[in-house]
A protein has these predicted regions:
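Extracellular/virion structural assembly segments
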Residues: 1-48, 53, 59-74, 91, ...
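Short beta-strand elements bearing conserved aromatic residues within extracellular beta-rich modules
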Residues: 77-79
Length: 245
């Protein structure tokens, strides 16, 4: 099933460091600015505790996503939560194996306090974005055959010389696109997809779990074009393009 992860509780919480410090050139807010090309970096290689306080029990969380571009390979990570801010329980822990996307799932939970602990790192940790989020699983999947473009989009400038020769200049990496068409959606999916659309609001890139089970960070490139096809039956377009660091 297709999924979206579009909330990040850090954006609606007080975020601080209960242990460790931030580099003045790589501030803490970069953990939740939705710009995966700009890094948060710790001020030293000491143990780091990133504390998130929602103010109340707050929003349901069941997934942590940290995009590639971090340097957490070999570091001990522990995600914890708490109702009172003093006694924490661990919901996920690992020694990170590489610098690829960190995708951690755990039992759905609502807690006021969350913290990510990086214990005794060998170097100062750096993180492009920290998402504490919840999956929205589509009630019905899109039709994939004959309606959607799934090829990569390349950023290439093609100039033609006076003699007719083609010259190509490649800028950066290609972007993934996923163009889906959903038909036969019920009123629950209509409500949920509109809630998603209002939350992303044309300016907050989000995560898509696509038909091939890949998590991609990106944006919608056109409106949903939600339509009523029959009583309580809806259709919409989902034209998605990857956002690169």
């Amino acid at each position: 099933m297709i999924k979206n992860a579009y909330i990040n509780i850090l954006e609606i919480s007080s975020v601080s460091l209960s242990t460790g410090s931030a580099s003045t050139s790589y501030p803490l807010y970069r953990l939740y600015d939705r710009d995966i090309g700009r890094l948060f970096k710790a001020g030293s290689s000491a143990t780091l505790e990133i504390l998130i306080n929602q103010g109340t029990a707050g929003t349901v969380v069941d997934r942590m996503l940290i995009p590639s571009g971090h340097n957490l390979s070999g570091m001990a990570l522990s995600l914890q939560n708490s109702t009172n801010g003093s006694t924490f329980a661990t919901v996920y822990s690992c020694t990170q194996a590489d610098t690829a996307l960190i995708n951690a799932t755990f039992a759905t939970d609502i807690k006021q306090y969350w913290r990510l602990v990086i214990t005794s790192p060998a170097t100062a940790p750096q993180i492009p974005e920290l998402f504490l989020t919840r999956d929205y699983t589509w009630e019905s999947d899109p039709h994939l055959y004959g309606v959607g473009s799934l090829d990569n989009i390349f950023n290439v400038e093609n100039d033609v010389a006076a003699g007719g020769q083609d010259r190509f200049l490649v800028f950066g990496n290609p972007k993934k696109q996923r163009n889906y068409k959903v038909v036969g959606a019920d009123s629950t999916q209509e409500t949920n997809i509109l809630t998603f659309n209002n939350a992303w609001a044309g300016s907050k890139p989000f995560w898509l779990f696509d038909h091939s089970s890949e998590w991609i960070y990106g944006k919608l490139v056109s409106p949903l074009n939600l339509k009523i096809d029959d009583m309580n039956i809806y259709s919409f377009d989902f034209k998605f393009l990857e956002v690169l660091p």
